[in-house]
Amino acid sequence: MFGIGARDLGIDLGTANTLVFVKGKGIVVREPSVVALQTDTKSIVAVGNDAKNMIGRTPGNVVALRPMKDGVIADYETTATMMKYYINQAIKNKGMFARKPYVMVCVPSGITAVEERAVIDATRQAGARDAYPIEEPFAAAIGANLPVWEPTGSMVVDIGGGTTEVAIISLGGIVTSQSIRVAGDEMDDAIINYIRKTYNLMIGDRTAEAIKMEIGSAEAPEESDNMEIRGRDLLTGLPKTIEITGKEISNALRDTVSTIVEAVKSTLEKTPPELAADIMDRGIVLTGGGALLRNLDKVISEETKMPVLIAEDPLDCVAIGTGKALEHIHLFKGKTR
């Protein structure tokens, strides 16, 4: 057996954001999963927030990209470089680093063996002594303080940037789960497409995300908020300002929300009766950034006829759970697909 020290890390390697948990300190890194590169030399210009601020604003020889897509690695070398940057950030105050850290890194529950191997290899290349995968919904459940090690059913719905993870958990394992590549990014795309088709206006990812956060809702609100947005008129090519309503955005998000709700319902249908009874008592717990979409908890509750709760600190649950799982790292040793 190997000891777990204060230098070991839990990493929530997300499509939208990367969080790093250090044992004894909590979350010490919280940055967008974005890297800015020189197109000719492939050298790194910026990582994280600095790189995200460059999206849509870079000169021709610099490109800001997200090396993760739908919860898996889309650009291996860039992901490894980004992870190395964040690992170094997390341990920069450790003085002379006695040894490389063990790293617990989250992966989507629907990932393939090849995709999981890429995450493990990238984590090792980034400076880990060794890397151990933990399924995202399991980490989210730990971070949400659900009784995952007990013989009782817990249900978590983790809505991240690239994937939505739905899982029933009992006795330290996932009983049944579903991973769909529909989540926060898909919501942003739906808003972009709606604005383009309805107003002939092109907006960027950052504007779409701001719209979602400010006036987005899983169902049409009784009193609709308005929001002024700017983009490029596709007819004239010139900048243009329009005003949109919350009801419009809830309509734009309808299909995405419906897909997430169907994933929740289909997972419940595969749940053993005893565990379903536990979930009816305890409720379905929502985690991830998507849990913050207004009225999503209400819509899921109405569709499933079950209580639905939003976890405390939903954005941090996966990272916290990944960090807490370091205490049980021996259970994950050699546990790959």
Curated annotation (Swiss-Prot):
Main location class: cytoplasm
Quaternary structure and interacting proteins, as annotated: Forms polymers. Forms a complex with Mbl and MreBH.
Note: B.subtilis has three MreB paralogs: MreB, Mbl and MreBH. All paralogs have the ability to support rod-shaped cell growth normal conditions. The multiplicity of paralogs becomes important under stress conditions. They are probably used to allow cells to maintain proper growth and morphogenesis under changing conditions.
Pfam families in the cross-refs: MreB_Mbl (PF06723)
Function, in words: Forms membrane-associated dynamic filaments that are essential for cell shape determination. Acts by regulating cell wall synthesis and cell elongation, and thus cell shape. A feedback loop between cell geometry and MreB localization may maintain elongated cell shape by targeting cell wall growth to regions of negative cell wall curvature. Filaments rotate around the cell circumference in concert with the cell wall synthesis enzymes. The process is driven by the cell wall synthesis machinery and does not depend on MreB polymerization.
Gene transcribed to yield this protein: mreB
Coiled coil spans: none
GO terms under cellular component: cytoplasm
Protein keywords: ATP-binding, Cell shape, Cytoplasm, Nucleotide-binding
Domain of life where this protein originates: Bacteria
Family: Belongs to the FtsA/MreB family.
Effect annotated for changing D158A: Causes a severe defect in cell morphology and in chromosome segregation. Can still form filamentous structures, but these are rigid rather than dynamic
Keyword Transmembrane helix: no
Activity control note: Polymerizes in the presence of millimolar divalent cations in a protein concentration-dependent manner. Polymerization is favored by decreasing pH and inhibited by monovalent salts and low temperatures.
SUPFAM superfamilies, alphabetized: Actin-like ATPase domain
GO molecular function: ATP binding
This protein's record includes keyword Transmembrane: no
Subcellular location: Cytoplasm
Entry binding sites for ATP: T15, A16, N17, G161, G162, T163, E209, A210, I211, K212, G289, G290, A291, L292
Knockout consequences: Disruption of the gene results in loss of cell width control. Depletion leads to a strong defect in chromosome segregation. It also leads to the formation of enlarged cells, to the loss of mid cell localization of the replication machinery and to growth arrest. Double dynA-mreB deletions have strong cell shape defects.
Name of the protein described by the UniProt record: Cell shape-determining protein MreB
One GO BP annotation of this record: cell morphogenesis
